[in-house]
């Protein structure tokens, strides 16, 4: 993750989350500082009264919203920064000198010298529930102060996160007021303050209620008094008070006023709801054991609100559960429970308070209800602020004797139990809200606590459901399409015992074709793309992992754009951003154009997103245009501004983003122009509306909006009387709705809807002009129940609210508000499902389906920062995929592709690499890490290089070792803290990653020290450290093979500085520049351990042992029934998988494992059933015992039958290809089948088998074509591939099509075989197969691209080595190599008859391979032909070089020439060859020189009898002649002389090989020729003469003729 995402996550994660909160950039005001709940009385509020804390470097100001105010007193404050100063005696705890910091809040303590001495917050960033410091009381330093911050979302935090990140232990900071430096003492005030203990907002079931609290700084004689609802309350000496209030049914507002000399100085209101309908018939109380029996025999008592009733969703109550409820009760994690036995003794307390501290929350806990006893459960919304959970946690101890009271009298628990016996309960297995894609749903669960099942009945919507004696039930329930509300009720003898309701959205026939949309946020990603290649590689990786569409953020929140052609608005380009965490984009690269270019190449949809009503970043102080348009800025009405309406950036309460007014016509027009300039200048597929909303409920209250609201009201006969009070006002910090509040919600929502209508009109107009569809979509928060606060109804106008949806404010949903739904203006919608569990995501997805009424495709937006752990990510992804049209992944900077790719495919992620870090003090050991260049995951050790981002993002409680580009440790933050386990002053561990270096980063879960102490003890400043990742070994672990040897292939990625070396079983393996390596391993029967060790600059970083099993009975190959499938969208079929053994084959369909490599196109389940999801092509694979088979699936929308691949003429796809030259492959049988298997070396091999009938028809269709090519493709990236063709059919058809070309291609290259050439070597009779193989030998991959690895042969020079091309015929399971159809010494005179037309033979060289020797042209008279190759993306024609050089080109670019037979023996002039002429000695020497690839000498030879212009002059000059100065050229070479000359050239060739650094490693065919083919080049056997006779092999004195020896054999090399 980028630094931005660590330091300021709200700038990356779409700020839809802000709709859940009201951020509090507080400024000191009269209301917020004193008048609510006591505290300081400031001067009149204004800009000059701002109170803020300045960071150490003076660059960051944190505004303070509350000063010496009990923020937990009613009304409880949220989204604040609060200041508590020494001596003020006002805190939010029971102690006047300590501030209560609850878990999930942040705080700092500053001493009297302005130095930060303590920081409290998360132990990991981004924080999770388990990575926060526990609840605690933070002492206020003498003469200093404490700052406390609270908000509800870390991702968009403007209080907690800035306080935690900008103020560090040891920093010297300063406190300011009105621009002047102040100190804690400046905020002291002698006036008393009010500290209410009684919580506001509670619901009670008793009319008798007590308000309690304390007057701080109280003293007698001050003229201080206090009233509760107008009645004066008695004040104790310490200012404490209690006042009884009689409640009425419904909501009660209790006024508490503090007066001085009769003048009100502080007031507060406590809101309490009295629910008389749900109260017990009598007052039921529990009484704890006496605190001090010498003082009072009675203990503290508390009312019990519910007896044997489900209290889920009910705040602030104590409930009693008896045996009537059941045998046990489940206590939620943050509740408190007390177990009491039949003798009224406490036997267990769940989440007790130890020594007055906040409980260490555990659970959920299943707690037994003792026979004859009971369980008390307390739950509330604030442990510190409400005395409910705290009551049970504090006053109840194991062994205490307690009492139950009814109307004041002690009673046994049985007196509180019902008379009907045990109460039956129903528990459901179903989620409370979910989406169903079938026409029915399965309801299942259990009825518990039944004393007599015959008296129990279960119904769903009134229909009886059967259940078993054990209470279990399972039934299928038919659903209506759309929303279904299901009410399940359990009755006992007709009386309701329990009920549950379900909300199910039914989408029968819902498309299973899923899109995966990747969001590329501007702020987090723009500067990473410095070149077009960066974009291409990024998108290619995304596509390979299942992404189908991209959303590119072209207008960020700051107002800068990611495109260059801002022809209508003149918006500045993103490279103009100055904020360090975002700056650095390439000013010369049009990012949008690059994204479009490569998206088109890869077949990805490209949509562009706009932060519509966002025009600046308050957090980063970046405003592209807003400072020039202050009238655009939102005017807000916040409680913190003391009743004033202010410009957003002048308000005491600010968010991270500066919004503009959606009601301003100039604003709207400018945003539309921004969209239009992109649509006119760029080829995009759609527009995404992001932040097309108001900032929050406080906006917009400008005069312009007021006038438009008045017009809106006038149209419905209403009038605005008081502005803004008719909308709402504030009582303290609590919003009080006015009479026009519902009109206001509707007005704002219709304002946003009208803008989406204008966008729709714009895109439709551009569509008509361009003739191209442009989709409109929106990205919104999934929390629809509160999104009205942002002025947005993103649903359908047909949506209707139901109580069972349990939304907070049902009054919002008026007929007019329903009309404001804008989903019909969209083509699809993305909802931010930022929840972190599958049930939560299911809930909000279903709510989205309900609200949108299924009218447009809906995609679940997943915040990747919340789901980094692989198992959780998989669960969340699948929850989103099952019930929506797909996923939107936010954001690209957060993606860990291996994890995300597995999660998208619903596969368990298995880390396919070993991360290792050297240990300075243990040279033979290493530290094994977990992940590299991914967001830090708790309880793991990671390595982060500068490709990850600017900094690590670790928290202040992590441990890191920072390693620079030289490999030296420069710092180890928190080393001492971890080793001593003293975290009083933690270091900053969000370390900047050195360029060219890396950081070892770790963090344990809270309270665990294992990983942190491991890293802290391992490294110290000055150590030399290296790191690497080893991969490739997984494929070999447990591999069973019958091969004699296996080529082990792996890869090493060095992280940071250094050069790697690898050994495999003790033998050094050649390491290529890209980090790949290979080594041959001998396999013996049984277990064969293979040990791989990696060292970087000599430092050991990795060691891995895998075991390969040698087994003659192992599977040899795995086959699918087809290699390709053509299916209609929605069609399903089952794969059939066969395992082939040495002498048999077995159907393993039921045992194989399956996966789809393109899940958006085709899915496959665990049984092998594949389903076509959407048009396109995809690959499915089956795996069994280490072997894999793949098949290509082509999906169309056609209505014809599927199951075959007719070919497209492009040669694409698995086993694809087609008849060339316009020929079309007929429909019918499968054209090819594809099998993934192993070759004799244990390498992966792809076998493509052609169907005879289809092939014959295709060849027949070639007749008469201008370019008659029959092509086949070997799919995939395996090191070897074979195309198997039915030879009999091929020979028969090629006989009638002599001009046809057979073309076979793979990722390694391509080969073209003329029909006339093949015909000579194909048997005339009998059944056989032609096998055409393209592969890479182990030696090829070892030597390929090694410096100095130049090879020469046949008069040519080759850089590196090349793929092997082999042609065999197979008959009766035996293979026989065809006569040298290889790139050496091949002539077309094989059939004995001339070909009537020129033919071509070419090899297309892939970029990773270096050279090949193509066969000679079969055009008569052609001596050599340029090699056609492809390099760096474009075609290149290579001609033979004129001279040779022993140096390999550093990039591996081939310096090639031909290996034509006719370059070995030239003609005799005038176009003749003179085949019956005898060779002279000089000509024969030249023949050997060329055949052995020896460099010719300069033409000016020293031999006086050799003409300098003779074709053989340079070749002869390579060696001396028999006599000084003379070569005796006219002598006839004898067989003995030829043998002698061969030995001489052989020895010379061996010496020449030594000139090359890798000469000893050259084992491919090129190298075989170079290193002395000697024995096989000798002229043994019978030699046929022109006269037709022959001589025995032993004869040494025969003439050597020109024709036959020209086809010299070469030393045999291992087949491909």
Curated annotation (Swiss-Prot):
Residues 1-30 form the signal peptide. Its main location: secreted. It is found in: Secreted, Cell wall, S-layer. It comes from the Bacteria. Residues 1191-1244, 1372-1455, 1523-1554, 1585-1616 are annotated as: Disordered. Residues 1536-1554 have a biased composition (Basic and acidic residues). Coiled coil: none annotated. Pfam families: Big_2 (PF02368), GHL10 (PF02638), Glucodextran_B (PF09136), SLH (PF00395). GO terms for cellular component: extracellular region; S-layer. Residues 1406-1416 have a biased composition (Low complexity). Keywords: Cell wall, S-layer, Secreted, Signal. Residues 1438-1502 form the SLH domain. Residues 1199-1225 have a biased composition (Gly residues). The S-layer is a paracrystalline mono-layered assembly of proteins which coats the surface of bacteria. May play a role in the export of butirosin from the organism. This is S-layer-related protein. It comes from Niallia circulans (Bacillus circulans). The gene is butB.
